[in-house]
Swiss-Prot record:
EC code(s) of this entry: 4.2.1.22
Keyword Amino-acid biosynthesis: yes
Chain residues that bind pyridoxal 5'-phosphate: 103, 210-214, 302
Gene: cysB
Keywords: Amino-acid biosynthesis, CBS domain, Cysteine biosynthesis, Lyase, Pyridoxal phosphate, Repeat
Name the record gives this protein: Cystathionine beta-synthase
Chain intervals for the UniProt region annotation (Disordered): 1-25
Length: 498
C-alpha cells in the first residue's frame, strides 16, 4: 500500500483521442440474479418533495442504500476485487486487508464472502457497532484502532493494515485511497446510471467526500458529457478535503461516519469539484432524521450532510433545472446512533426543550441525585500500575473496571476488564506492562457526559442505557464509581420505604 495522500497518479485525460487504459464495465441487472453481487448498482433515483419545498429547482436523490450491502461502497468493494482477480494480483486463498470507516469493508467482505477470500478489516473505534456486527457476520476479522490517531501513525487503521500486510503471507491491501478501481466504479457505473435516469439533464450534482472516489468518478464522467454541470462536494467541519483551505477547521472532531479525512486521498481530484460546502454534525443528523420521517428515505448520517449541502447549493438553480444528491448509505448501520432519540439528546443534537420534556417524564426518581446514593470512595490506580497488579485489584474487589488517575487525582482514563483481556489474549500487552498501554484515555477534545454528585438519577438512568458504569467527578477529581446495581439498590430501598 502506497502513501494514501498525494495527487492522483492517473495520467489519462478525458475528452481526448487518447484511449483509456482502464478496464470499463457496466452490466445491466438480471431478472434472476446468479448471486447477491448482481444487485450492486442500478440504484433508484427518487424525487425529494417535502424537504426541498423551498427550492425552485427539482431535487432528486440517488439512493445508494439499495445496493446489496447497503451503501455506495459496495460498488468499489466489488470492482476492486474483480479487477485484482482479472489482473492476476490476487488468487483464491489469499487474504485481503483494508483500512476503512466500515462501508468499504462491508462491500469488500460481501464480495469476499461470495468469492471465498479471507477478509481483515482495520476500523477506527468511533465507527458504529452495527458496522462491526455486519462485518463479523460476513466472516471478516475486525481490528479496532484509536479514532484520534493521525492517518500516518503506526496505530492508525492505515498503519495497522500496513503492518498486517507485511506480516501475513499472500495478503493484499486493495487500498481504496489509491486504487483506480474506486473512481472507475463510479465513472463506469454510478455516473452512467445518472445520465441514463436523468436522460442527460443534470444541472448540479452533490456528493459527500471520503476517499473521494465517488465524487471523482462521477464528476469526470459528468464533466465529459455535461461540461456546464456544477459539481458540489460536501465535507464535515474537522476535515481538510474542501477548497479553498480557509474553509477547513482542523481543531474540531466530528461524529458523522464515512466522510472527511485529515489527509487528501490519492483518488480525490479536487480540481473536478466546482464548489465545497462544509457541514456540522447537528444539522446533518437532524436532516437525516427529516429524510426518514418526511421522505421515507432510510438513510445514514452522511446522507443528512449531503442533503444539507444540496439544499444550500441548489438555491442558485432556477425553475426547470435539476439537482442530483447522492445518499451514500442506510440507517441499518446507525440504529443505536442518530436513529436513537436518547443518543441525539446525549450528544446535544436536539433542542434543549426535548431534553427537558424527556427528563420530566421520569418522575420515579423524585428529584434525587447521585449524592443520594451514598457511594463509597473509589479504588483507583495510576497509569504506571502494572496489568498484573490491576488484575489482582479487579479480582479482590469483584470489579470489571478501575479508574486511572494522575498524582493530583485527576481522572486520566479507565481500565476495563474487557479491554485488558483483549490486549493480553492477543499478546498486544503482557502482565508487566503499565496499564497506560491498555487503558481508555479521556482526551480533552472528546466530548463526555459529566456525572457529578448533583447529576439527577433520571439523567444517570439514561446514561446507563449505553454505559455499564460512570465515574463521578468534581472539578476533574474522582469522587466515586457508580454502577447499575447502585441505582437498582436505591430504587428497591425507596420502594420499601413507600
Amino acid at each position: 500500500m502506497s502513501a494514501p495522500e498525494g495527487p492522483s497518479k492517473c495520467t489519462w485525460t478525458p475528452n481526448t483521442t487518447e484511449n483509456t487504459p482502464h478496464t470499463t464495465r457496466r452490466t445491466p441487472k438480471k431478472l434472476i440474479m446468479d448471486n447477491i453481487l448482481d444487485n450492486i448498482g442500478g440504484t433508484p433515483l427518487v424525487r425529494v418533495n417535502k424537504v426541498s419545498s423551498d427550492l425552485e429547482c427539482e431535487l432528486v436523490a440517488k439512493c445508494e442504500f439499495f445496493n446489496a450491502g447497503g451503501s455506495v461502497k459496495d460498488r468499489i468493494g466489488h470492482r476492486m476485487i474483480v479487477d485484482a482477480e482479472e489482473s492476476g494480483r490476487i488468487k483464491k486463498g489469499d487474504t485481503l486487508i483494508e483500512p476503512t470507516s466500515g462501508n468499504t469493508g462491508i462491500g469488500l467482505a460481501l464480495t469476499a464472502a461470495i468469492k471465498g477470500y479471507k477478509m481483515i478489516i482495520t476500523l477506527p473505534e468511533k465507527m458504529s457497532q452495527e458496522k462491526v456486527d455486519v462485518l463479523k457476520a460476513l466472516g471478516a476479522e475486525i481490528i479496532r484502532t484509536p479514532t484520534e490517531a493521525a492517518f500516518d501513525a503506526p496505530e492508525s487503521h492505515i498503519g495497522v493494515a500496513k503492518k498486517l500486510n507485511s506480516e501475513i503471507p499472500n495478503s493484499h491491501i486493495l487500498d481504496q485511497y489509491g486504487n483506480p478501481s474506486n473512481p472507475l466504479a463510479h465513472y463506469d457505473g454510478t455516473a452512467e446510471e445518472l445520465l441514463e435516469q436523468c436522460e442527460g439533464k443534470i444541472d448540479m450534482i452533490v456528493c459527500t467526500a471520503g476517499t473521494g472516489g465517488t465524487i471523482t468518478g462521477i464528476a469526470r464522467k459528468i464533466k465529459e458529457r455535461l461540461p456546464n454541470c456544477i459539481v458540489v462536494g460536501v465535507d464535515p467541519h474537522g476535515s481538510i478535503l474542501a477548497q479553498p483551505e480557509s474553509l477547513n477547521n482542523t481543531n474540531k472532531s466530528y461524529k458523522i461516519e464515512g466522510i472527511g479525512y485529515d489527509f487528501i486521498p490519492n483518488v480525490l481530484e479536487r480540481k473536478l469539484v466546482d464548489q465545497w460546502i462544509k457541514t456540522d454534525d447537528k444539522e446533518s443528523f437532524i436532516m437525516a432524521r427529516r429524510l426518514i420521517k418526511e421522505e421515507g428515505l432510510l438513510c445514514g448520517g452522511s446522507s443528512g450532510s449531503a442533503m444539507v449541502g444540496a439544499l444550500l447549493a441548489a438555491k442558485q438553480l432556477k425553475k426547470g433545472q435539476r439537482c442530483v444528491v447522492l445518499l451514500a448509505d442506510s440507517i441499518r448501520n446507525y440504529m443505536t446512533k442518530h436513529l436513537n432519540d436518547d443518543w441525539l439528546v446525549d450528544n446535544g443534537f436536539v433542542d434543549p426543550e426535548y431534553k427537558t420534556k424527556d427528563q420530566q417524564e421520569e418522575e420515579k426518581y423524585h428529584g434525587a441525585t447521585v449524592k443520594d446514593l451514598t457511594l463509597p470512595k473509589p479504588i483507583t490506580i495510576s497509569a504506571t500500575t502494572t496489568c498484573a497488579a490491576a488484575v489482582q485489584l479487579l479480582q479482590q474487589y469483584g470489579f470489571d473496571q478501575l479508574p486511572v488517575v494522575s498524582e493530583s487525582k485527576k481522572v486520566l482514563g479507565q481500565l476495563t476488564l474487557g479491554n485488558l483481556l483483549s490486549h493480553i489474549a492477543s499478546k498486544k500487552a503482557v502482565p508487566t506492562d503499565a496499564v497506560s498501554k491498555v487503558m481508555f484515555r479521556f482526551t480533552k477534545n472528546e466530548k463526555y457526559i459529566p456525572i457529578t454528585q448533583s447529576t439527577s438519577l433520571a439523567t444517570l438512568s439514561k446514561f446507563f442505557e449505553n454505559h455499564s458504569s460512570a465515574i463521578v467527578t468534581e472539578n476533574d477529581e474522582i469522587i466515586s464509581i457508580v454502577t447499575k446495581i447502585d441505582l437498582l439498590t436505591y430504587l428497591m430501598k425507596s420502594q420499601q420505604k413507600n
